[in-house]
Amino acid sequence: MAKGQSLQDPFLNALRRERVPVSIYLVNGIKLQGQVESFDQFVILLKNTVSQMVYKHAISTVVPSRPFNVSNHQATNAQAGYNAQHDDGDEK
């Protein structure tokens, strides 16, 4: 698994499993809404009245419409590792 996938896979999988409605904002400003039906390394399949294949490189932000659990030990460890690498010691 690539380092960049260690947070997004558990996040997207939890959205898919719990059928959480999401808003996906593209880099060009377009807002798409639906539920994550499936995903892979390059695309997210978003289902609303129709299914849309959205390329990840075109996505700016994924916003869940409600709280959900990302209960994945790997995601927690990845975030802790990221925080440790980016902690410069300056507390504000």
From Swiss-Prot:
Assigned keywords, A-Z: RNA-binding, Stress response
Segments of this protein annotated with the region Disordered: 73-92
GO BP terms: regulation of DNA-templated transcription; regulation of RNA stability; regulation of translation, ncRNA-mediated
Domain Sm: 9-68
InterPro entries in UniProt: Hfq, LSM_dom_sf, Sm
One protein family per Pfam: Hfq
Disulfide-linked positions: none
Keyword RNA-binding listed: yes
Gene Ontology CC entries for this record: cytosol
Extent of Polar residues compositional bias: 73-82
Gene Ontology molecular function: RNA binding
Binding partners and assembly: Homohexamer.
Family statement: Belongs to the Hfq family.
Described purpose of this protein according to its UniProt entry: RNA chaperone that binds small regulatory RNA (sRNAs) and mRNAs to facilitate mRNA translational regulation in response to envelope stress, environmental stress and changes in metabolite concentrations. Also binds with high specificity to tRNAs.
NCBIfam families membership: Hfq, PRK00395.1
Protein name: RNA-binding protein Hfq
Naturally occurring in which organism (per UniProt): Shewanella pealeana (strain ATCC 700345 / ANG-SQ1)
Gene: hfq
